[in-house]
Amino acid sequence: MNLQHHFLIAMPALQDPIFRRSVVYICEYNDEGAMGIIINKPLENLQVEGILEKLKIVPEPRNPEIRLDKPVMLGGPLAEDRGFILHTPPSDFSSSIRISDNTVITTSRDVLETLGTDRQPGNVLVALGYSSWEKGQLEQEILDNAWLTAPADQNILFRTPIADRWREAAKLIGIDIVTMPGVAGHA
């Protein structure tokens, strides 16, 4: 089982305040564990333009048709002061890792400098912090019915309204998660 470029979808019984009703995009999955970004938990009162202002980045030349008032996500409980940008190619920034044919993660300032300009990648999601699991930890959480998994979908990752991502991600595997009971058993 390789969960890279998959969604983790929190089961209704998962009540952890950070992960409750969350969708996590898995960026890396290997023998050492997993790393992902929550894609549906916007930080209060923080938008992309606020990050750019804080870092003194002025988009040049500014394309007014590109909106910078998109919310910044809480990517997870670790390194909440560190930025992670999920985007579509190109991946020619100084700290980019290609996750799939159409998804890249970048942690360097140079991608931020393209936001709001014609050089910006087509789709962008900005997050602060990340989520991580040690070897075997995520697999155990899945066995314990904390998570569903589904192949990642670009539309949900970048375009689906944030409030709908949990429900829509579950629909990828034919589940109406809103009507699912809070406690599941093993068959």
UniProtKB/Swiss-Prot annotation:
It comes from the Bacteria. SUPFAM superfamilies: VC0467-like. Pfam families: DUF179. InterPro entries: AlgH-like. GO terms for cellular component: cytosol. HAMAP family: UPF0301. Belongs to the UPF0301 (AlgH) family. This is UPF0301 protein KPN78578_33170. It comes from Klebsiella pneumoniae subsp. pneumoniae (strain ATCC 700721 / MGH 78578). The lineage of its organism: Bacteria, Pseudomonadati, Pseudomonadota, Gammaproteobacteria, Enterobacterales.
